[in-house]
From Swiss-Prot:
Keywords recorded for this protein, A-Z: NADP, Oxidoreductase, Plasmid, Secreted, Signal
Signal peptide: 1-22
Organism: Haloferax volcanii (strain ATCC 29605 / DSM 3757 / JCM 8879 / NBRC 14742 / NCIMB 2012 / VKM B-1768 / DS2)
Enzyme class (EC, first level): oxidoreductase
Catalytic activity from the UniProt record: D-xylose + NADP(+) = D-xylono-1,5-lactone + NADPH + H(+)
Protein name per Swiss-Prot or TrEMBL: D-xylose 1-dehydrogenase (NADP(+)) 2
Length: 325
């Protein structure tokens, strides 16, 4: 499969383009609004073609799919533009800035006959796959989930992640992982209560703490921040045991990963060989395109996660719990 890369964002340059190149697929073209920047990245990574506009890349008839690592607030427009060209789309999380917009871009891609998948790479790591398997089959009913993804964004940073016009904020950048993990183990919550704080007077949340409640009695606590040392974990308490992954999301592809769980009076730590989650994500996306199968991160999951994020922001604004239908 021939991939075009819309933008020269760090996650693409450092992780996704190398993942495409390590697979049986090809990063065939890259675009930037700064043609010199596109050419420099193309030369550095061995990409055959560089374009000075996103429109020019989308007009390249040799491409089968695009990867979109643009700022959050630009995702929806470029997903639609790619679909108009008949290109399949792997788009960075969060897919859009709201649940309604997420549903709308899935509708658009379905009408265009192209596959759309949101790029939550951690969902493709064997650690996550095993955690989901254990919770579903061996540990009993889930009582609670606690998940946090935080890191320290340098003070004074001129960064798209704190730009309100580009759908920035800690929830959109890393809190979405915590919400995704809660959904993986518990599903969509029935109500949400959350607080957010803008510690930098930048117009977006730089800290979030939320409680997701379920009619079953289960709860999830989700947190994110731009103000603390890096933290990325989930912990699951069940009726018959517990489970923890730390680190859980952006796992070093050159290092082994560990998953610890307890049940029947024993504690087990499973170790996973170094794994490139991004490569597995790319391969899974391409397989979905080629076979017509539903992507692992599908419409239902993407809309559900975004509905919860919408509720987090609404609750933080109103100070009240938000019911999800």
């Amino acid at each position: 499969m021939m991939f075009g890369i819309l933008g020269t964002a760090g996650i693409g340059v450092k992780s996704v383009i190398p993942a495409v190149q390590a697979s049986e697929h090809e990063a065939a073209a890259i675009a930037s609004r700064d043609e010199a920047r596109a050419s420099a990245v193309a030369d550095e990574l061995g990409i055959p073609t560089a374009y000075g506009s996103y429109e020019a890349l989308l007009a390249d008839d040799s491409l089968d799919a695009v990867y979109i690592p643009l700022p959050n607030g630009l995702h929806a427009d470029w997903v639609r533009a790619a679909a108009d060209r008949g290109l399949h789309v792997l788009c960075e999380k969060p897919l859009t800035a709201s649940a309604d917009e997420t549903a709308a871009v899935f509708d658009y891609c379905e009408d265009a006959g192209v596959t759309l998948m949101e790029a939550f790479m951690y969902r493709f790591h064997p650690l996550t796959e095993r955690a989901a398997e254990l919770v579903a089959s061996e540990l009993g009913a889930v009582v609670s989930v606690t998940s946090n993804f935080s890191f320290r964004l340098p003070d004074g940073a001129d960064d798209i992640r704190i730009d309100p016009d580009l759908a920035g904020g800690s929830v959109m950048d890393v809190g979405c992982y915590a919400v995704s993990a809660a959904r993986l183990f518990l599903g969509t919550p029935d109500r949400v209560y959350a607080t957010t704080t803008d510690t930098r007077d930048c117009g977006v949340d730089t800290r979030m703490s939320g409680v997701l409640e379920y009619d079953s009695g289960a709860t999830a606590r989700v947190e994110s921040s731009f103000d603390t040392p890096e933290t990325q974990y989930y912990r699951v308490q069940t009726t018959d045991g517990r489970l923890e992954a730390n680190p859980a999301f952006n796992v070093d592809p050159t290092a082994a990963a560990e998953l610890t769980y307890a049940t029947d009076g024993r504690v087990v730590t499973e170790t996973f060989d170094p794994t490139d989650s991004y490569r597995r994500e790319v391969e899974a996306f391409a397989r979905a395109v080629e076979t017509g199968e539903t992507p692992r991160v599908d419409r239902e999951e993407s809309v559900s996660v975004m509905r919860t994020i919408d509720a987090i922001y609404e609750s933080a604004e109103t100070g009240a719990a938000v019911e999800l239908d």
